[in-house]
Amino acid sequence: MSEGIDIKELKRRMDGAVSAFKSDIASLRTGRASANILDPVTIEAYGSRVPLNQVANITVPEPRMLTVSVWDKSMVSAVERGIRESNLGLNPIVDGQSLRIPLPELNEERRKSLVKVAHDYAEKSKVAIRHVRRDGMDGLKKAEKDGVIGQDESRAQSERVQKMTDETISEIDRLLGEKEKEIMQV
């Protein structure tokens, strides 16, 4: 087979968009506690902003409770402040060198707004996947124009790129559907 584009590289980039989407939706709060909920939280520590998981250990002792064990006692108030200011709607309770974070029930309005955020993440990922497809198609057109591959080979590879794109976007839609169900579950 003639050289046109690196299909494996396109697949790797599309899979990267799916991984980023999985990471994004994992941080969305559902009815159950998950340490990923606190992924977006950053703390003012040692002169810079660092992710919470670099200054504390996060555990899930109960379905509606998170526990954050801060490694450095002097950081407890900074961790509490970071969680309160994170716009996650969480109110940590300081308990010595750790914080307990009860997760309130999600009301219908909050659930719908979380679903909307999940849809935004999905759309962002689909756009990234389409950019990868466009890069691949542009590469094929250039290779065909430069005489590196023939028209038939270009068409065959272009169909493979489109099929790969469709499958990857279907995967995003499937993951979105699962997350939506999880969020709306009461």
From Swiss-Prot:
User: Listed disulfide bonds for this chain?
Assistant: none
Query: What is this protein identified as?
Result: Ribosome-recycling factor
Q: Where in the cell is it found?
A: Cytoplasm
BP GO annotations: cytoplasmic translational termination
Entry-linked Pfam families: RRF (PF01765)
Lineage, top-rank taxon, reads Bacteria
**Gene3D superfamilies the UniProt entry points to:** 3.30.1360.40, Ribosome-recycling factor
Does the keyword Protein biosynthesis feature in the UniProt annotation?
A: yes
Q: Which InterPro entries match?
A: Ribosome_recyc_fac, Ribosome_recyc_fac_dom, RRF_sf
> What the protein does?
Responsible for the release of ribosomes from messenger RNA at the termination of protein biosynthesis. May increase the efficiency of translation by recycling ribosomes from one round of translation to another.
Keywords, in A-Z order: Cytoplasm, Protein biosynthesis
Which protein family is named in the record? Answer: Belongs to the RRF family.
* Protein's organism: Rhizobium etli (strain ATCC 51251 / DSM 11541 / JCM 21823 / NBRC 15573 / CFN 42)
Q: What is its main location?
A: cytoplasm
A single GO molecular function term of this UniProt record:
ribosomal large subunit binding
